[in-house]
């Protein structure tokens, strides 16, 4: 992470982002199984654009249309994520979600926007710390909630070959079946270990527990574990592959996911 010359702008943006999130009226998990990722605290560098392709498919998932939402088993989900770094502490991500149904049909599934800020290095915190807010729309046939909001604190730390990241995410439905439930707790955690300078292995956990003031019954909660592999193909590349296993009846049983990313640099110079 690069040092920040002025702290007040970062604090102001973080406060504004969090304030907007907490002040927005009464979320179901936003875009389940389209972007399956535990975030690290680092933001994209200024004058850099990160392009990522998230590819996911449920090998064993829902087999029928349920509550008006299309089946997940056999559907191939493709998400294009483009993230632009503006300063050493601020980035904005844009998402386009698509799905290829078993018919086959290629369908647009929605768009999201995600601003994110992070604590600068010269704060000398013992952990990496950042905050993202993601909002967007998805058609009713893909989600019981059409407008959603996600507030994601990100805390991570590297100890030698070990890496841990915790995302205690809060989701909120702005319009749809769950709009009256308030914030719901959807934690994500990653533990990784560097086998070599090129290969890392790890375990990722994703959950959806329900409203923060009244968790769902255990069988209605969603819990997934993904053994994953990350490849360090160079400073411009990102690669992640995993196979996920659902642990409850409400979770897709087997999901395969892959993330492939590349950074485009548009110039160099100090961030302002």
Walk through the language-model features, giving the residues of each.
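Generic short amphipathic/hydrophobic targeting helices enriched at N-termini
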Residues: 9, 13, 32-34
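Bacterial N-terminal signal peptides
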Residues: 12-25
């Amino acid at each position: 992470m690069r040092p920040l010359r002025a702290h007040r702008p970062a604090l102001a943006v973080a406060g504004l982002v969090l304030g907007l999130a907490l002040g927005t009226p009464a979320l179901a998990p936003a875009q389940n199984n389209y972007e399956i990722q535990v975030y690290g605290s680092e933001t994209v560098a200024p004058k850099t654009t990160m392009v990522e392709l998230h590819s996911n498919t449920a090998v064993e998932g829902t087999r029928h249309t349920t509550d008006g939402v299309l089946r997940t088993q056999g559907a191939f989900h493709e998400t294009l994520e483009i993230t632009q770094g503006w300063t050493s502490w601020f980035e904005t991500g844009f998402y386009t979600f698509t799905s290829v149904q078993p018919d086959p049909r290629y369908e647009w599934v929605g768009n999201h926007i995600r601003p994110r800020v992070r604590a600068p290095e010269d704060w000398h915190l013992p952990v990496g710390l950042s905050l993202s807010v993601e909002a967007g729309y998805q058609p009713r046939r893909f989600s019981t909630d059409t407008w959603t909001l996600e507030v994601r604190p990100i805390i991570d730390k590297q100890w030698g070959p070990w890496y841990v990241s915790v995302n205690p995410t809060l989701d909120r439905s702005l319009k749809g079946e769950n709009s009256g439930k308030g914030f719901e707790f959807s934690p994500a955690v990653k533990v990784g270990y560097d086998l070599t300078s090129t290969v890392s292995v790890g375990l990722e956990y994703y959950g959806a527990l329900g409203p923060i003031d009244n968790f769902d019954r255990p069988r209605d909660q969603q819990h997934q574990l993904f053994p994953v592999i990350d490849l360090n193909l160079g400073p411009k590349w990102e690669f992640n592959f995993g196979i996920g296993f659902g642990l409850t009846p409400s979770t897709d049983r087997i999901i395969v996911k892959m993330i492939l990313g590349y950074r485009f640099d548009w110039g160099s110079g100090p961030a302002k």
